Amino acid sequence: MSLQDPTKEHNNTSPSPKDEKTDYVVDWDGAEDAANPRNWTTRTKTAHVLCVSGFTLYSNLAAVMFAPGAPLLVADFHITSTIVASLTVSIYILGFVFGPFLLASLSELYGRLWLYHICNLIYLAFTVGCALSTNTAMFLAFRFICGCAASGPMTIGGGTIADLYEAEERGKAMALFGLGPLLGPVIGPVVGGFVTEHLNWRWTFYLVLILAAIIAIAGAVIMRETFEPVLLERKAADERVRTGNRQLRARTSDGTRTANQLLLRAIIRPLKMLCVSPIVLSLSVYCAFLFGLTYLLFTTFPAVFGLTYQFSTEQEGLAFLGLGVGMIFGIALFAILSDKLLHQPRGGTLARPELRLVLMVWSSPLVPIGFFWYGWSAQSTTHWIVPIIGTAVIGIGAFLILMPAQLYLVDAFGTEGAASALAVNTGLRSLFGAVLPLAGPPLYSKLDLGWGNSVLAFIGLAFVPVPFVLYKYGETLRKRFPIDR
């Protein structure tokens, strides 16, 4: 145990009030303390990141895996409202809007591990409920709760990576973490199409349930708490019992606030970031529009590949693989370049987090280019591979925008603020992902695929300056609009 005892540093003098504030502070036992998560072995750290990535994979897989089977559920439950029919898919994403704000706050107060386990248990229970639902109200309620629970790993995963890695080591870890959120929506329709075709819509939930149960059990066996304030508080509590010294406290503890005040501050922090920080607001809105545009793009696939190119239900799912290939290419670039760009400046000072945005600066035009490519090639009825290549370009750009943005927020707000910053990002992203696709049918009915996707491309172009501005002025904005962590 590391204790700061001023009597050893100021012999024959009485401690001043300032000295007393640092008496009996419990900290790590030096820089190499094996109990510090940042000193865990590479194997242990990687295992934790893979578990979190697995959590996000099944939670995002479930978002769209059911979509091919939605018409069958609509028929089974005799749903006549088009809005309710759309909600059978999108209400899951709405759970991602509300869940993050509470879960991020709790994780920054009580730790990460127990939240992962509770969210996994809730998710498993209500996925069973979805599979066994007998009416519309039951299904929608269970599906919404599943979405709220599934948002947990999405929200606090970035905080876990901040706990485990120094800033210059986070690139590859974030690339692993990003596999689930970005590949899940691509793989989901492929698997869902085959399952629905050969079994029924209920089996899309049973399949996700089996996968989620396996990953949840692995996480329960492998994972440990990573949040430094919780670990140091436990250490301080053990030392208070061992020594009988009630004055011992953790270095990270806030002795000036009550538990209720700390909880209130933690709950307010994400909303404060959204309202006060231009960085969080601008990046979250950019990511939200991009996420929403991608989900809106998905709404065109049945018409483009099913009607125009005469794909079967199974083949329609394969059309999503263009996005998947693009995202895999983006993952490779991000993993290779992200940490290299965060080079150590001269003089030994810490690299500024804005260096994370370099990839975002160069890749931001790719998404508009991809939408132009996809829209006009589909309208011209070129060979089916041409619009799929356009979606691959969108996939590369999407990954190289979303991941640098999230990693920048992690670096900028640190281990105690990362989850709150990502809660805002995830919440807005999910809101736009649920709402923007509703604009698809009227947009394409009036403008067709060419000009309809051109409108989306122009929206993407409007956001291209955002990473340029934040790269240049982000450090100034962080200092001018600080967030109390």
Swiss-Prot record:
Keyword line: Cell membrane, Membrane, Transmembrane, Transmembrane helix, Transport
GO CC terms: plasma membrane
Signal sequence range: none
Main location: membrane
SUPFAM superfamilies associated with the record: MFS general substrate transporter
Transmembrane feature ranges: 55-75, 83-103, 113-133, 144-164, 175-195, 203-223, 278-298, 317-337, 357-377, 384-404, 421-441, 449-469
GO molecular function, a single term: transmembrane transporter activity
Database matches in Pfam families: MFS_1
Places the protein is found: Cell membrane
Disordered: annotated span: 1-22
Membrane topology: Multi-pass membrane protein
Family: Belongs to the major facilitator superfamily.
Physiological role: MFS-type transporter; part of the gene cluster that mediates the biosynthesis of the trans-fused decalin-containing tetramic acid phomasetin.
Protein's name in the database: MFS-type transporter phm3
Source organism of the structure: Pyrenochaetopsis sp
Lineage: Eukaryota, Fungi, Dikarya, Ascomycota, Pezizomycotina
Name of encoding gene: phm3
